[in-house]
Amino acid sequence: MKTNYIYAVLLSLLFSTFWGCSDWTETESEDYFEYPGADYYANLRNYKQTDHQVAFGWFGNWTGLGASMVNSMMGLPDSVDFVSIWGNWRNLDEARMADKRKVKELKGTRALVCFIIQNIGDQLTPQGQTAEEYWGWDSSSAAPDNPANLAAIEKYANAICDTIDKYDYDGFDIDYEPNYGHRGPLSGNDAYMLHFIKTLGQRIGPKSGTGRLLVIDGEPQSIVSESGPYFDYFIVQAYNSTGDADLDSRLNST
């Protein structure tokens, strides 16, 4: 009887295991991911054209390659309206160009060039040349009406816009932080910054009529107030912030 009992238990376990695993052998898919259809992306693009609270971020380590999409703009959340490319915005290869083009065409997500503005020619002065040599900057005088420096500023601003045109970016994000270690001959001179922004504003920003964005981040509350109408967005960074009320105060003072 003991032997029969053991056999009965083993047989019962065998059947329960067999029937318990039978669902694994089903050949028909019962629950699987479906990619969004054309209507989803059309609605997403249309939504981003409406007046709404935008989603923004900085995007670094961009390659446009990799199965995980962590280094691709296509891997960004669908709700992101625009991003500022940090560090790897220049000399775009086909992978990054294709990634940027696809995310804009499919999701309506836009990409901006972004870097710190401190000195004339930052990020664009050719290697081996000085700002004085390449841009015609006169470092001997910071007079607001110095014709050499005003011309150098115009040349620099237009070079930024030329870069935007070359790679089909959607605008420029000025990282402006004069009170956090980045005060220079350009960023520390209100007259020069206003001339710089006005020159940019002829080709990008709300006054240009091009649809390309001009954005300022970091310390927009510190920029010369006359420049305000030339920007699409002000982005306040939380350096030394004490809380939401402090950030609101900074924004309201722009």
Regions found by a protein language model. Give the residues of each.
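Bacterial Sec-dependent N-terminal signal peptides
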Residues: M1-A8, S12-D51
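Chitinase-like catalytic core of GlcNAc-active glycosidases
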Residues: D51-T254
